[in-house]
């Protein structure tokens, strides 16, 4: 029954009941809209897979990830102002994130250095290295050249401080002569019969190549862009051996 009384209804009409029915519906719509927004900024739509079951937007997820990276570096003194950091870069997503984050740390250090009057704390250096593994994975020279050019473009597009890119063949672990090194590398790899053993050997040679180059060129920190899946594989593999 409709009520048109301006002084308030004293009869048993359904006006209040109708208002009660509307209120929960409005709240439900509001709650649904909030659930479709980023839990941090409350402004953008969440991105699937961007942390905490996809509840963050891309910008907030990136900001949160960088904050954790910076906290881990600062809390454990992984990078100090006097360090020279070598980033192992493959071009994959993990190494790209590692390079970008350490670049942003270096940028912040550079801004603090420029703003300080005494300039007592130097800015840590950053270099980038790419390991050429064509001695193990034979690919056309044009493909590896294109890949190296793409990596050079990625590194050069980073804002200052400038970072030097180094390209080292994996066989350089044996000797400085490319021909002799490649021959010795092939001989060693061919001596391992199973595929898993060859992959393990390649991993060890890759790490030795990176460590050798870092020590010979003044780098005292080596940064690897390893994802959690790769680390988990290494742990499981080492456990069952």
Feature locations, PLM:
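ATP-dependent adenylation/nucleotidyltransferase module used to activate substrates
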Residues: 2-241
